[in-house]
Amino acid sequence: MATVNSNFLKLQSNYLFADIARKVTAFKNANPDRRVISLGIGDVTRPLPPAVIQALHKAVDEMGDATLFRGYGPEQGYAFLRDVIMQYDYKVRGVTLAPDEIFVSDGAKPDVGNFQELFAQDSIVAVTDPVYPVYVDSNVMAGRSGEIKDSQWSRIVYLPCIKENDFVPDFPAVRPDMIYLCYPNNPTGTVLSRAALQGWVEYARREGCVILYDSAYEAFITEADIPHSIYEIDGAEEVAVEFRSFSKTAGFTGLRCAYTVVPKALRISDGKSGSVSLNALWNRRQCTKYNGCPYIVQRAAEAVYSERGQSEIMGIIAGYQRNAAMLRTAASEMGFAVYGGVNAPYIWLRVPDNTDSWGFFDRLLQQAGLVCTPGAGFGISGEGYVRLTAFGSPEDTEEAIHRLRSLC
């Protein structure tokens, strides 16, 4: 009989959002006449912008024309998309990249989960706490976690992000090899100032670490002094990989397109006396394990950068931002301590003192038909909080606020 990779047996039996879905399904089955409003999983609700739909239609028609048909594309992404990414996401912010430092994919989640494959198995990983579960689980699968004790892994370094430090992590006491940072943050909705991000870049340069920087929510930044890219910080190209997504920016959660930036200046030890390029290694990995994002999807992503596309997605994002502002204001008026929601689509809500995260989740679901995400599902430091998302419709957001008020 074949033998399992035992690291997979260390994983919790269920993924956080699968647990939530199971509870919600049970509630709906028991209460078929009650309409449930979800402020839980961070999926968008607005349809794709018309400019994107038009580009999709055109690309589909091309695939039906023998003279225009495209088969396998470049694993790294088509030049037409990499060029506009380089121009509109980076050059306009004073960041210089080469097209071959951009790798287009079918999602930031697989890229974030897979990039750790390039590092030695005994590499030390640091994550913020609370944390997006993929950062931890992918390293558990890779055999880097050690053993679980008191809900934390023995070989993973946790960096608490709590009220007392304004949700900005302190530098780790133990030097890690890989540092996962996500800003604007999921789940807390908080951000790093330019000075704070510069501090992390300087730390990584000093200690020889690599920052894996997830900026999937950068389009929601409203404050001028908050960096949109880690490469706005001098020297970051030598210590950081950046993950970007079209999912929340342009509603691509069901279409799937993202990209990862791996600067050619970024090198790590070869385990001997030399160093190797992470750009070259990621390119090699992708050529072996990935056949590229579909042509029609990349044409749709290209349309996001058109003048019409930018206008349309900015309108959609503005709607989600209004939802976040409504949730923040209403929750504050109800007496909740509220964080995030200014530069991100997430609200981090402190639950009443007499309950815990899952208890408050159950109360909202059972008494108000509302779905949130329990903070404890993101780590120890998330206990006592829940995450609310602003991705609903304005009408559902207003109704959710009304239901929440009825409990207070």
From Swiss-Prot:
Homodimer. GO terms for biological process: lysine biosynthetic process via diaminopimelate. InterPro entries: Aminotransferase_I/II_large (IPR004839), DapL/ALD1 (IPR019942), PyrdxlP-dep_Trfase (IPR015424), PyrdxlP-dep_Trfase_major (IPR015421), PyrdxlP-dep_Trfase_small (IPR015422). Pathway: Amino-acid biosynthesis; L-lysine biosynthesis via DAP pathway; LL-2,6-diaminopimelate from (S)-tetrahydrodipicolinate (aminotransferase route): step 1/1. It catalyses: (2S,6S)-2,6-diaminopimelate + 2-oxoglutarate = (S)-2,3,4,5-tetrahydrodipicolinate + L-glutamate + H2O + H(+). The modification N6-(pyridoxal phosphate)lysine is found at residue 248. Involved in the synthesis of meso-diaminopimelate (m-DAP or DL-DAP), required for both lysine and peptidoglycan biosynthesis. Catalyzes the direct conversion of tetrahydrodipicolinate to LL-diaminopimelate. This is LL-diaminopimelate aminotransferase. It comes from the Bacteria. Substrate binds at residues 15, 42, 109, 132, 186, 291, 387. Pyridoxal 5'-phosphate binds at residues 72, 108-109, 132, 186, 217, 245-247, 256, 291. Belongs to the class-I pyridoxal-phosphate-dependent aminotransferase family. LL-diaminopimelate aminotransferase subfamily. Its EC number is 2.6.1.83. The lineage of its organism: Bacteria, Pseudomonadati, Thermodesulfobacteriota, Desulfovibrionia, Desulfovibrionales. The keyword Cell cycle does not apply. The keyword NADP does not apply. One of its GO terms (molecular function) is L,L-diaminopimelate aminotransferase activity. Signal peptide: none annotated. Keywords: Aminotransferase, Pyridoxal phosphate, Transferase. It comes from Desulfovibrio desulfuricans (strain ATCC 27774 / DSM 6949 / MB). Its cofactor is pyridoxal 5'-phosphate.
